[in-house]
Amino acid sequence: MQVTAPRTVLLLLSAALALTETWAGSHSMKYFYTAVSRPGRGEPRFISVGYVDDTQFVWFDSDAASPREEPRAPWIEQEGPEYWDRETQISKTNAQTYRESLRNLRGYYNQSEAGSHIIQRMYGCDMGPDGRLLRGYEQYAYDGKDYIALNQDLSSWTAADTAAQITQRKWEAARWAEQLRAYLEGTCVEWLRRYLENGKETLQRADPPKTHVTHHPISDHEATLRCWALGFYPAEITLTWQRDGEDQTQDTELVETRPAGDRTFQKWAAVVVPSGEEQRYTCHVQHEGLPKPLTLRWEPSSQSTIPIVGIVAGLAVLAVVVIGAVVAAVMCRRKSSGGKGGSYSQAASSDSAQGSDVSLTA
């Protein structure tokens, strides 16, 4: 797959993080699949990435010299050879099936063989504080557009167009939603609990944000106040600005949460204020790593470039870390849902973290 520019990577990864953030006390496990055809340059490329909460833990790339499911987090390395053999077999089977699906969907849309096309899948589960399924996901996209998705009732589908309706009919005939529901309510949650226990020092930690407010003059009459939150984990955080105690939500510029490249996250929120009225504005920060919410004001004597330097350094690290490893995964969230097709064959045992995963063809 072609390497994406750093700015694009950041935008795509931000979109993915918006997906992985869940309710307080809950956790998630999601897999992102991407298959890209490349006429004249060999077989389509297939990439699979797994996440627990905001942490990537497995990776598979069909273009590797010896394609294998690979660990991407220290706590997953304790899994035995059977685990890696099983997950590798699932990914290899999916790679072949998604290649067939690309050919079939090209026919559905009456497209020529000359162009490159992409199928993306995101599926997984959110687990609530009680250890049960909170929400399940099964979404597909084709060429960057919604294709088909499992509804929240986990028993019906939403097809984006007439081509996707063909897939929907096949899946309904195969009772695919029932199998998915069993996986989401059972195997997915069970593996998520296991991963959370094995990686609890990393996955269940709560690093509080380092916070600061900076001041940036716009003119003689206005200035921007920017509230920074750096170095926090997990990714879920709330930044709000108030003027004399009243929320300024509509007037706040808020960026998506961004990875810092060191397994922590960054975010900022900004407001434009009249010069001389800066002290009427307060930034409020809520995060599970804080014993109580923070309230900050701009302190003229403490103006510092440290937060800006921290952001720049973090983004530089991020560009190096994720360009090769995350692009394929996060693109799936950006497109939201999409497409493959309908027949299925068992690829591995139900003990697989990816599920009693099936190979789907259009």
From Swiss-Prot:
Signal peptide residue numbers: 1-24
Cell compartment(s), UniProt: Membrane
Glycosylation sites per record: N110
Ranges facing Extracellular side: 25-308
Keywords from the named record: Disulfide bond, Glycoprotein, Immunity, Membrane, MHC I, Phosphoprotein, Signal, Transmembrane, Transmembrane helix
Annotated region described as Alpha-2, given as residue ranges: 115-206
Disulfide bond among keywords: yes
Residues of the Ig-like C1-type domain: 209-295
Compositionally biased intervals (Low complexity): 343-362
GO biological process, one term: antigen processing and presentation of endogenous peptide antigen via MHC class Ib
Segments in the Cytoplasmic topological domain: 333-362
Region annotation (Disordered) ranges: 336-362
Record-annotated disulphide pairs: C125-C188, C227-C283
Transmembrane segments: 309-332
Membrane protein topology class: Single-pass type I membrane protein
Phosphotyrosine modifications at: Y344
Residue positions where Phosphoserine is found in the record: S343, S345, S349, S350, S352, S356, S359
GO molecular-function term, one example from the UniProt record: signaling receptor binding
InterPro entries: Ig-like_dom (IPR007110), Ig-like_dom_sf (IPR036179), Ig-like_fold (IPR013783), Ig/MHC_CS (IPR003006), Ig_C1-set (IPR003597), MHC_class-I_related (IPR050208), MHC_I-like_Ag-recog (IPR011161), MHC_I-like_Ag-recog_sf (IPR037055)
Keyword Cell wall biogenesis/degradation attached: no
Gene3D superfamilies in UniProt: Immunoglobulins (2.60.40.10), MHC class I-like antigen recognition-like (3.30.500.10)
Subunit annotation: Heterodimer of an alpha chain and a beta chain (beta-2-microglobulin).
UniProt similarity note: Belongs to the MHC class I family.
Protein name per its UniProtKB record: Patr class I histocompatibility antigen, A-5 alpha chain
Lineage: Eukaryota, Metazoa, Chordata, Craniata, Vertebrata
